[in-house]
Swiss-Prot record:
GO terms for biological process: translation. This is Small ribosomal subunit protein uS15. It comes from the Bacteria. The keyword Ribonucleoprotein applies. Residues 1-23 are annotated as: Disordered.
């Protein structure tokens, strides 16, 4: 479940902090969130795809670690990122 180039560029443009930003934490979390959403939809129709389920859990863990890093650095960046992506209540 990979993202095509246009989808990646759209996510990068939406979440980048400056013009040439492609690897900031915000962009990484946004990319992971999109891949997690796609893989979750896949797993709803393919319940027995255990290797994809394991990959999904790894991506969720990576996103959690990145969000914890952002939260330690700046609470305002964390809260704006979470609300922008619509994750966590």
């Amino acid at each position: 479940m990979t993202l095509n180039t246009e989808a990646k560029q759209k996510i990068i443009n939406k979440h980048q902090t400056h013009g040439t930003d492609t690897g900031s934490v915000e962009v990484q979390v946004a990319m992971l969130s999109e891949r997690i959403n796609q893989l979750s939809k896949h797993l709803q129709s393919n319940n027995h795809d255990f290797s994809s389920r394991q990959g999904l859990l790894k991506m969720i863990g990576q996103r959690k670690r990145l969000l914890n890093y952002v939260k330690k650095q700046s609470e305002s960046r964390y809260s704006s990122l979470v609300t922008k992506l619509g994750i966590r209540g």
